[in-house]
């Protein structure tokens, strides 16, 4: 910079612009790069970083171009930042940068020549501030000015005179007015000189912050240069007029512009955050409530402790009730009134009410008690786990009743005693008559165990959880146990509840010392603990498990499942009922009793699922025969197909074979004789 060549006109402009025009002959020695005596004016004394202190205590002035370059950089940065924020419609930040630039220009206006050179730039900056203030005017105020046919200006105006003494005696302005009286220009210059000697942050940091405007981030203003309307003593008359418009304070980091009437303006100053300060978290909560049409006031987000300490709070201090770290689980000691769902959800997993989805929030609201508090079992669980378990609730009627199940009279009677009757008459089924809390349905596959669970969901007016192994397992270590806790916690909140676990042997198989993963063992242990814990006598929760491998169940799980019902293969009468019921639904039943007896004898050892597949294959016989006659399937009608006959079932028996072996039936019968609940 020192070696560059400039013209005389440029040199004269730079000296007059930055306050060097009053030095006289001294400037020639400075421009020539020679040593000179220290600056005569305290306002033009360079910062400490530009002074080279020698051992003898003498000081050497730096190259004047460096200081000019720093001033130009600051001017361009602030001016560019204000223009950039105006383009982005960020009027609040543009206003702050414009005011900082205005103060910077005023600090360099020492002589009349300086004011003449700086005047055009100052008027341009003032116009940018006016544009920012017009952008900050709320829609309601703008409409009011349009109706009054008046240009937007100061909200508080007075056509007549005002009493200065009354203002001095005011609670808010008396102190500042009394302090400002008697202060001359000399005192202000001395104070400015003192401020110049205070070490400040390097200007490179401010330049780095302002360069972030090329992206989406916004540079934060310097805290040492922020001043409010009340304590700004050195502002010019034009600055006072600008700051008075619409009551926006300039001592805020990011002032929150909200629509407020003149009547409640005082209430906002007293109850809201002091000096208009709004933290990022509270600002986000206010925006979310405004989008959802909430009528809760922004001041309710702050706890009483934070309101009490807000007056002495700086930018580096922390207020009570706010999170102190990333995903912190800090619980504020003060309990707020009103809707407690958001406060409770903030305790779960460190998430606030704004971080939850609508489905998760709805799920938590359904589980809250009359006081708006979550039960003790669910407070330490993450909301997503609670929602995951709640999604397993069967909210649709499976349209299965006891009449749709063939045979199994003993199983129907036991389930009615354990589920249906206690729900209808809880006053009778208590004490010694209280039903068991565990039911096991075991038997060969395809015999109707899952169908019994669906019938329970249709007959019992209770919350029905349809659980499988995938519902309680996760790839994350420790999450399976939390899902088990969430399952029984939600069931306790939604009681009367029925938990149906299909293929329960996959979850509660026998625990082994070798060859078993640690996470699987912890999951079984947690499940057994919850099964033992919810059996308190007063809770209406029933656990039903269905399995094809009862011999692989853990002994502790077998003890907790007090009723163990064997679901055998359907009898001859049950098989005939299945055939008749399925064919009558489609209007295809024309078989005689002799044909039914023959079919039942030929289907010995078939399960209920095998019988259903047999009927489906038999009904395909008339269709295959019609297609063999050359009828196009696109033109085929029901009249072209004959009814189902015995021969169709005999042909289907060649395609559909029984799925259960006789050896497996022996295992089920032996286990039933040893551990099952036998029929009377």
UniProtKB/Swiss-Prot annotation:
Substrates-to-products reaction catalysed: ATP + H2O = ADP + phosphate + H(+)
Disulphide-bridged cysteine pairs: none
GO molecular function terms noted in the UniProt entry: ATP binding; ATP hydrolysis activity
Amino acids binding ATP: 406, 446-451
Any one Gene Ontology BP term: negative regulation of reciprocal meiotic recombination
Species for this entry: Arabidopsis thaliana
Biased composition (Polar residues): 295-308, 336-346
SUPFAM superfamilies cross-referenced by the UniProt entry: P-loop containing nucleoside triphosphate hydrolases
Cited function: Involved in DNA double-strand break (DBS) repair via homologous recombination (HR). Limits class II meiotic crossover (CO) formation by regulating the invasion step of meiotic HR. May counteract DMC1 and RAD51-mediated inter-homolog strand invasion to limit CO formation. Functions independently of FANCM.
Enzyme Commission code(s) on record: 3.6.4.-
Positions of the UniProt region annotated as Disordered: 214-234, 250-275, 288-352
Coiled-coil annotated spans: none
Name this polypeptide is given: ATPase family AAA domain-containing protein FIGL1
A single Gene Ontology CC term: nucleus
Broad class of where this protein is predominantly found: nucleus
Taxonomy, superkingdom: Eukaryota
């Amino acid at each position: 910079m020192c070696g560059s060549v400039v013209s005389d006109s440029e040199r004269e402009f730079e000296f007059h612009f930055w306050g060097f025009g009053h030095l006289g002959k001294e400037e020639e020695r400075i421009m020539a790069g020679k040593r000179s005596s220290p600056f005569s004016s305290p306002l033009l004394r360079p910062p400490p970083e530009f002074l080279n202190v020698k051992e003898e205590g003498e000081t050497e002035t730096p190259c004047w171009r460096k200081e000019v370059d720093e001033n130009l950089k600051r001017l361009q940065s602030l001016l560019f930042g204000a223009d950039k924020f105006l383009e982005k419609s960020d009027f609040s930040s543009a206003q702050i940068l414009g005011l900082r630039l205005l103060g910077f220009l005023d600090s360099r206006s020492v002589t009349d020549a300086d004011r003449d050179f700086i005047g055009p730039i100052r008027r341009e900056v003032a116009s940018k501030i006016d544009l920012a203030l017009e952008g900050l005017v709320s829609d309601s105020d703008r409409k009011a000015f349009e109706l009054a046919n008046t240009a937007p200006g100061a909200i508080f105006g007075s056509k007549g005179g005002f009493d200065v003494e009354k203002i001095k005696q005011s609670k808010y302005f008396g102190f500042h007015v009394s302090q400002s009286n008697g202060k001359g220009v000399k005192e202000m210059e001395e104070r400015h000189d003192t401020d110049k000697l205070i070490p400040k942050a390097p200007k490179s940091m401010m330049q780095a912050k302002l360069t972030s405007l090329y992206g989406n981030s916004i540079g934060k203003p310097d805290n040492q240069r922020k001043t409010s309307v009340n304590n700004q003593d050195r502002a010019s008359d034009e600055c006072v007029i600008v700051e008075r418009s619409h009551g926006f304070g300039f001592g805020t980091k990011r002032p929150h512009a909200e629509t407020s009437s003149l009547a409640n303006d005082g209430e906002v100053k007293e109850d809201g955050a002091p000096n208009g300060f709004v933290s990022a978290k509270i600002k986000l909560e206010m925006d979310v409530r405004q989008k959802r049409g909430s009528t809760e006031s922004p001041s309710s987000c702050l706890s009483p402790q934070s309101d009490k300490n807000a007056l002495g709070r700086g930018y580096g201090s922390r207020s009570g009730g706010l999170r102190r770290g990333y995903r912190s689980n800090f619980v504020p000691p003060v309990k707020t009134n009103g809707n407690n769902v958001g406060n409770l959800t903030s305790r779960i997993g460190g998430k606030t009410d704004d971080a939850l989805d609508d489905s998760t929030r709805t799920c938590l609201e359904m589980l809250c008690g009359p006081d708006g508090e979550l039960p003790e079992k669910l407070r330490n669980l993450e909301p997503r786990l609670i929602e995951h378990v709640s999604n397993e609730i069967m909210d649709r009627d499976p349209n299965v009743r006891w009449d749709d199940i063939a045979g199994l009279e003993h199983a129907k009677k036991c389930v009615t005693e354990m589920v249906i009757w206690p729900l209808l008459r809880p006053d009778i089924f208590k004490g010694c008559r209280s039903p068991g809390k565990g039911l096991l349905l075991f038997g060969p596959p395809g015999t109707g165990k899952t169908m019994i669970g669906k019938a329970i969901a249709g007959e019992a007016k209770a919350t029905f959880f349809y659980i499988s192994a995938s519902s309680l397992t996760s790839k994350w270590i420790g999450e399976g146990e939390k899902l088990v806790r969430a399952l029984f916690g939600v069931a306790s909140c939604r009681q009367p509840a029925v938990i149906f676990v299909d293929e329960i042997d996959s979850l509660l198989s026998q625990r082994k010392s070798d060859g078993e993963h640690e996470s699987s063992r912890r999951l079984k242990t947690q499940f057994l603990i919850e099964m033992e814990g919810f059996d308190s006598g007063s809770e209406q929760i029933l656990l039903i498990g269905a399995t094809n491998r009862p011999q692989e169940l853990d002994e502790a799980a077998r003890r907790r499942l007090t009723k163990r019902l064997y679901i055998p293969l359907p009898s001859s009468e049950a098989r005939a009922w299945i055939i008749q019921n399925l064919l009558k639904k489609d209007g295809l039943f024309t078989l005689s009793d002799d044909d039914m007896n023959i079919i039942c004898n030929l289907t010995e050892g078939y399960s209920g699922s095998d019988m259903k597949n047999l009927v489906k294959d038999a009904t395909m016989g008339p269709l295959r025969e019609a297609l063999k006659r050359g009828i196009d399937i696109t033109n085929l009608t029901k009249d072209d197909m004959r009814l189902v006959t015995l021969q169709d079932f005999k042909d289907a028996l060649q395609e559909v074979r029984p799925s259960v072996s006789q050896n497996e039936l022996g295992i089920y019968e032996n286990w039933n004789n040893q551990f099952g609940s036998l029929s009377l």
